[in-house]
Design a protein with these regions (language model features):
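Intrinsically disordered, charged low-complexity linkers and terminal tails
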Residues: 3-7, 30, 55-58, 62
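A ubiquitous short alpha-helical element
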Residues: 6, 38-47
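Long, compositionally biased
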Residues: 91-117
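Short, charge-rich, low-complexity alpha-helical interaction segments
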Residues: 11-35, 111
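Amphipathic protein-protein interaction modules
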Residues: 43-92
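Short acidic/histidine-centered micro-motifs embedded in hydrophobic/aromatic stretches
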Residues: 24, 28, 75-79, 99
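Long, charge-rich, low-complexity intrinsically disordered regions
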Residues: 2-10, 113-116
Length: 117
């Protein structure tokens, strides 16, 4: 699937999987592990370079492609739809939960994580 077709699916609110998202990113971008933070003030989660790489790639991809917060969350597939929405009081997938609360305002990268191939 092409990058343009994938982005059109996301923008049309069609269901995509985490695996599809990571595959599209890997096919179209070079990844550089980087530290990123997600959240604000006492709810800020700092992710060291090389940790939570799926989240790092997805947030960087969504930012580059100017996706809305809801479109960005859809990129996490079942981690968002089942694990987080299905367990609203849970503590798993904290990067997703923080993004739901703080959106793009809470996302900060130490450096650029993705570069187009």
């Amino acid at each position: 699937m092409s990058l343009a077709h994938f982005l059109q699916q996301v923008k049309n609110n069609e269901t995509v999987s985490f695996e599809q998202t990571i595959k599209i990113i890997s096919e179209n971008y070079s990844y550089q592990p980087t530290e990123f933070s997600n959240g604000l003030a006492e709810n800020k989660l700092t992710n060291a370079a090389g940790s939570n790489e799926g989240s790092c790639k997805i947030f960087a991809f969504a930012k580059i492609n100017q996706l809305s917060p809801q479109q960005t969350l859809s990129l996490f597939g079942d981690f968002y739809r089942k694990d987080v929405l299905g367990d609203p009081a849970g503590t798993g997938h904290q990067n997703i939960r923080n993004f739901m609360q703080f959106g793009w305002e809470g996302i900060h990268f130490a450096q650029q994580a993705l570069a187009a191939k």
